[in-house]
Regions:
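Active-site-adjacent loop/helix micro-motif of nuclease/hydrolase catalytic cores
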Residues: 72-79, 123-126, 193
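ATP-binding glycine-rich loop module of kinase domains
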Residues: 27-84
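C-lobe/activation-segment region of protein kinase-like
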Residues: 137-141, 145, 160-163, 176-232
């Protein structure tokens, strides 16, 4: 789960943990905005770019995603392939991201650098059903994007090498402040049901729960799409 816009608490502002990334200047300001995800911490920062608008340098906001675990080169190739699959199938719904290997807090590891998404509404939260239906009616582009997301996700589940896209993280699929749908997870974005029994023959109950929650939320997205079409 990746949370990109929730500001740090006042306590967190004074107790920021260290994050020393060798290839990122310490002068680049960033703040920890989420430490609750399954795979990573999320830091948010910004800097002025060389691009200009009306004679003024633009300000670019970005997120740094730092994994909880150490990843091998093979792991990193899997992460990149999965993210590239997202980008190829979902286009601009998935932010551009760079997977970089460097020294982080004294150890070799990977981090993800991506443009920040300003989360406006949690489209995958079933408690927001009525509001979600109204928003999909009001913003047809978002509705088309969500329909594309659902179609692609179902295709992955029903195709060869079946996989379930990670909707377990509540903030993985959102509507941004431009009223467009964004998928913002980065680390291990798919669950594979054929791995449920792979370790010693025992059922992986944690993985099973994540798959079931993701499938329920996918069904919920199909439901709000149908409801928004019925009321048009």
């Amino acid at each position: 789960m990746d949370s990109e816009t929730k500001p740090p608490s006042k306590r967190a502002e004074y107790e920021q943990p260290e994050l020393d990334i060798a290839c990122v200047s310490p002068r680049v300001r960033r703040a920890l905005v989420s430490d609750s995800g399954n795979h990573c911490q999320v830091w948010r920062g910004g800097r002025r770019s060389d691009e200009q608008t009306d004679g003024q340098n633009n300000f670019v906001e970005f997120v740094l995603k730092y994994p909880r675990d150490s990843y091998t080169d093979a792991d990193i190739r899997i992460l990149r392939r999965q993210y590239e699959m997202l980008r190829e199938s979902l286009g601009d719904m998935v932010p551009e991201a760079l997977f970089a290997i460097t020294c982080i807090n004294g150890k070799r590891n990977v981090f993800v650098l991506a443009r920040a998404v300003n989360i406006w509404f949690n489209i995958a939260n079933p408690t927001n059903r009525e509001e979600a239906v109204g928003l999909l009616q009001k913003y047809p582009m978002a509705r088309d994007q969500l329909q594309q997301f659902v179609d692609v996700a179902r295709g992955w589940r029903e195709g060869p090498n079946p996989r379930v896209i990670d909707l377990y993280g509540m903030d993985n699929l959102v509507m941004d402040n431009q009223r467009q749908i964004r998928y913002i997870d980065s680390f291990y974005v798919f669950f594979f049901e054929d791995l449920l029994h792979i370790l010693g023959g025992e059922r992986d109950l944690d993985l099973e729960d994540k798959i079931n929650v993701s499938l329920r939320r996918l069904a919920y997205l199909e439901e709000i799409l149908a409801l928004s079409a019925d009321k048009q």
